[in-house]
Amino acid sequence: MFSKSDFRGIINSMGLVFGDIGTSPIYTLTVIFLLTRPTEVHVIGVLSLIIWTLITLVTVEYAWLAMSLGKKGEGGTIVLKELLVPLIKSGRNAAFITLLAYIGVSFLVGDGVITPAISILSAVEGLRIIPDFQDIGQGAIMFIAGIIAVALFSVQSKGTEEITWVFGPVMVLWFASLAFSGIASIFYTPGVLRAINPYYAISFLLHNGFTGFFVLSEVILCATGGEALYADMGHLGREPILKAWRLVFSALVLNYLGQGAFIIRNPESKNILFEMINQQAEVIYIPFLILSITATIIASQAMISGMFSIVYQGITTRIIPMLKIDYTSGKLRSQIYIGAVNWLLLISVLFMIFEFRDSHRLAAAYGLAVTGTMSITGLMMTLIFYLKGRMFRSFVSLFVTVIDVVFLLSNTYKIPHGGYWSIVIAAIAFSLIIIYTSGQKKLYELMNPMKIGDFLEKYKQVYASENKISGTALFFARDINYVPRYISNVMFENNIIYEDNIFISIIKCESPFGVKSSFAKDLAKGLRVFEINVGYMEVIDVVQILKDKGIQEKTIFYGIEDILTSNLIWKVFSVIKKLSPSFVQFYKLPSDKLHGVLTRFEM
């Protein structure tokens, strides 16, 4: 049985991991039966498709396969790339995998914009079941959804640490409500239990041709958020998430079966979940509606936190430009707030709400990015298992990837119906990553750093002959074997040399977590190297690390790149660099000690 710590982990997982997939029953079946008639045969077939989609794409792909692949317990698209690239000998193939990972991250961004919009909008539409609100206009529904979204995004800067403890119990209550309402409905139409047999899923696809194929594009809505199992593994641990998934899976299946039973009895139903609850117990409908809106807010909060985490991961692995980051918790450094991401997300979510107007139309745009992410995850897992010689898992992963691709192809029909928006958003994110990484590579080539041997030879001469400034000066250098041009400009052209000069090198490790710092070696008299080895998911306080090691700097020098170019792509890169906070702003180094050194580059 479960221990006390197990229960705590399970409840936390329900609140932080399963919000998205847990709120899918609000709209999934309602949207599906806009595409196909709700006959008993169709209902059983669709239910079977949903159950086996949850089994293959969430349980097998993420809970079993993906969660067996981690780095120090951490999961996600970037982790898969970090695992796969070292296994590949060809540089060209490694570059292709890196490109795939960039596309995967971009799809997650595209998905992240639609999730809060469809979740909140579909829950608010439940107001129409209340007699006094039956005639409420869609404009009012959108306005209420917009107000909820604005309120949610507005509190992010204050941090959510104080209220996250509520998320788990609320979602436990939500899943319990889904399970019990499902059981109550199944009791009157037990024939829906046949849907557990995959025969009915296959039969539905075989007998409905293109309609059946297109229905798959809406069936995938039941699995949106499944990728959170793997992405959040590092925060909550593998075991609590897997144990929570058993309970969540059971609640979801029971509720979908219950909704199926309800629509067999009430084929004219337009908002299946809410009408089912209202018919079962009208007196608890309003509390259930409030609970559903709260659950969608929690799901949206998990998505926002996930986006902050993805962007931070991208910044530390140098695929996304630096952005201003605030720490919203005095206890947990992982509790972060990225203002630029927060407000761009809010604008995008509001655009989705007011562009698509209702959840049915929004569902027509939802799924493309999700299936794209799943397909990339499946392909990368297949290659990892194959290259590690784990053939059975490689075969299963390949089978799941084929299913992912089938779902992806079925979603292509959504492109002219609004699906292009997720592609546009993903394309913007992908273009930003490509321009930034290519620009950084080109800029580094132009920097023409001095080899450490040449630098030391000149340094020793200058240090011995020039008057030295008392105190300690810090210089930041990514690789001490190649000294950045700004350092040689300060020391050799401007003749600014301190008694104690320290090169600070922040080295990103292959592991996601861990921080180690130490003085590496003395390069010469008055010249030392201090290394900070940090995991690519770790949030660090550089100022505190320096203080703990007894470093009392008088001045901090850093490089500023001024880019001159007539090339359009590099002009975009130049604008990105100018709009991005500098290295020292990102790490919040004390402004009264900073001295930026400008170097001009022609690209």
From Swiss-Prot:
Q: Name one GO cellular component term.
A: plasma membrane
Q: Where in the cell is it found?
A: Cell membrane
Task: Give the transmembrane region(s).
Answer: 15-35, 43-63, 94-114, 136-156, 163-183, 201-221, 244-264, 284-304, 336-356, 367-387, 391-411, 415-435
Which keywords fit this entry according to its UniProt record? Cell membrane, Ion transport, Membrane, Potassium, Potassium transport, Symport, Transmembrane, Transmembrane helix, Transport
Briefly state the protein's biological role: Transport of potassium into the cell. Likely operates as a K(+):H(+) symporter.
- PANTHER family found in the cross-reference section: K+ POTASSIUM TRANSPORTER (PTHR30540:SF83), OSMOTIC STRESS POTASSIUM TRANSPORTER (PTHR30540)
Entry-linked InterPro entries: K+_transporter, K_trans_C, K_trans_N, Kup
Q: Know the name of this protein?
A: Probable potassium transport system protein Kup
A Gene Ontology molecular function term of the record? potassium ion transmembrane transporter activity
Query: What is stated as this protein's family in its record?
Result: Belongs to the HAK/KUP transporter (TC 2.A.72) family.
Q: Which reaction is recorded as catalysed by this protein?
A: K(+)(in) + H(+)(in) = K(+)(out) + H(+)(out)
User: How does it sit in the bilayer?
Assistant: Multi-pass membrane protein
